[in-house]
From Swiss-Prot:
Its main location: secreted. It comes from Phoradendron liga (Argentine mistletoe). GO terms for biological process: defense response. This is Ligatoxin-A. It is found in: Secreted. GO terms for molecular function: toxin activity. Belongs to the plant thionin (TC 1.C.44) family. Keywords: Disulfide bond, Plant defense, Secreted, Toxin.
Amino acid sequence: KSCCPSTTARNIYNTCRLTGTSRPTCASLSGCKIISGSTCBSGWBH
């Protein structure tokens, strides 16, 4: 699961993923983070 700090970051992440880029790379580019659980930390709910 990916957690992003803003809607903008989420959009960047989603667009990046559409091009077939890996999750870790897209998370790094967009400022999002990948978590192993199912609930994002407070403030990372986008």
